[in-house]
């Protein structure tokens, strides 16, 4: 059986932390900032962790990622 390949689109969007969790960026950050509040824009700048419900599925796509 051939080796599993890392999903390259996911590899660009997620980073592993030292404890093994996955960091992700927020959505809604590419344009239309005039319609968003300062608070909303400030919170969108911070990275977030992948939720436990999605973790297993994303980890399978990133199996070979270091």
Curated annotation (Swiss-Prot):
Q: Tell me which PROSITE patterns the record gives.
A: RIBOSOMAL_L35
Positions of the region Disordered? Answer: 1-28
Query: What InterPro entries is this protein classified in?
Result: Ribosomal_bL35, Ribosomal_bL35-like, Ribosomal_bL35_CS, Ribosomal_bL35_sf
Q: Which residues form a coiled coil?
A: none
Q: Give GO BP annotations, semicolon-separated.
A: translation
An MF annotation (GO) of this entry: structural constituent of ribosome
Q: Where is the composition biased (Basic residues)?
A: 1-26
Q: What Gene Ontology cellular component terms go with this record?
A: cytosolic large ribosomal subunit
UniProt keywords (A-Z) are: Ribonucleoprotein, Ribosomal protein
Q: Which family does it belong to?
A: Belongs to the bacterial ribosomal protein bL35 family.
> What name appears for this protein in its UniProt entry?
Large ribosomal subunit protein bL35
| Species name | Geobacillus thermodenitrificans (strain NG80-2)
């Amino acid at each position: 059986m051939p080796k599993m390949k890392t999903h390259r689109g996911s590899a660009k969007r997620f980073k592993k932390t030292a404890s093994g969790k996955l960091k992700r960026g927020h959505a809604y950050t590419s344009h239309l900032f005039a319609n968003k509040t300062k608070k909303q824009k400030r919170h969108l700048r911070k990275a977030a962790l992948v939720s436990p419900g999605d973790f297993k599925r994303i980890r399978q796509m990133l199996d070979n990622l270091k």
